[in-house]
């Protein structure tokens, strides 16, 4: 019989992930407003930025990609109108009826909605996101407040005594950036 594995205590990944997501969104939102509408290459690049998030596991155990692509024939996680049906409350229009900027902003709103259910990610994935986007490990008070407002699944979010680390409390326990 193989030896029983000790369950590893989750610490960094969840909080790191949340800080990463906000930093990514902030950068993308800021730049999207500056992009020329007719620059197809740049817009394709910006739409593809979301691929980094598609393997994140959600509260239900599915990856974000699985949630988005249920019933959709396209392998592209964020480009198919069928895949966007999960964002009914966001009402993403067909590309022919809107500009790239408008579609992009609505798409991000939808993804933010789905990411509200993200509660865990393994350390390797979190590390990749941090590395790819140069996300700082320490969160500012503003980022912490955004995390608190965004992740309504958490019972409480607060800075620790030093004022630089994020501590999150949920039904699953406490998570803190070490």
Swiss-Prot record:
Upper lineage: Eukaryota, Fungi, Dikarya, Ascomycota, Saccharomycotina
Superkingdom assignment: Eukaryota
Organism in which the protein naturally occurs: Zygosaccharomyces bisporus
GO biological process, one term: plasmid partitioning
Role played: Plasmid partition require REP1, REP2, and a cis-acting DNA sequence (known as STB).
Gene: C
Keywords: Plasmid, Plasmid partition
Protein name: Trans-acting factor C
């Amino acid at each position: 019989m193989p030896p029983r594995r000790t369950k590893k205590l989750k610490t960094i990944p969840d909080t790191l992930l949340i800080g990463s997501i906000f930093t990514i969104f902030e950068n993308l939102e800021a730049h999207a407003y500056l992009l020329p509408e007719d620059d197809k290459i740049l817009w394709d690049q910006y739409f593809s930025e979301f691929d980094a998030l598609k393997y994140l596991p959600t509260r239900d155990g599915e990856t974000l990609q699985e949630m988005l692509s249920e019933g959709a024939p396209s392998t592209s996680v964020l480009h198919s109108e069928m895949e966007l049906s999960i964002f009914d409350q966001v009402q993403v229009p067909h590309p022919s009826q809107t500009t790239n900027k408008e579609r992009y902003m609505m798409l991000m709103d939808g993804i933010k909605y789905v990411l509200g259910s993200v509660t865990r990610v393994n350390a390797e994935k979190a590390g990749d996101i941090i590395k790819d986007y140069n996300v700082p490990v320490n969160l500012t008070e503003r980022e912490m407040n955004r995390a608190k407002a965004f992740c309504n699944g958490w019972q409480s979010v607060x800075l620790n005594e030093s004022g630089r680390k994020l501590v999150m409390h949920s039904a699953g326990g406490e998570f803190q950036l070490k």
